[in-house]
């Protein structure tokens, strides 16, 4: 069990309740978002623990508690963020897993396994007109426009649902979709009705459940690595 706490410590326990060697680890600021665990270096390599911290930094720890080279990284501009929950997906087609974060400044940032930013998720990747407190939701990742590149879907506090192209970082046609209340829930991507096409599902702050048909095939066996909250 791996757990991030508001006391700034990252904990890891064995099934018998004892600490995993190397844990807990003090990351220096509260851990308010959900952590993500995945194999950044490929399927045969040890797990990495990706931790969003309230000072706007993203830490990556290995299974023994040691830090991964190149991390922590800060969401630009430095300090923006309250520990937004990351998604893990290959965003540039190099066969390795990247870290996807929707920041409070209204932009999506992607970092590779070395901590470097992944283009085009640097300048053109705005999902919201808000420049602070833009979202409490986590991004989800799948190829929803059929071009073979993973796209990012995320909601914002203005009540809109954005979908950004993995090829360009720009808003996909037909988005953003307006809702009557803040899009605080993390969306999910699925074939909900069995028609072979993609549906986008989310809940707004007013408690309304939204489901949209998206007229392209849903292919979970393909590049749909993070289609819902983990």
Outline where the language-model segments fall.
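Extracytoplasmic/lumenal domain signature
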Residues: 1-230
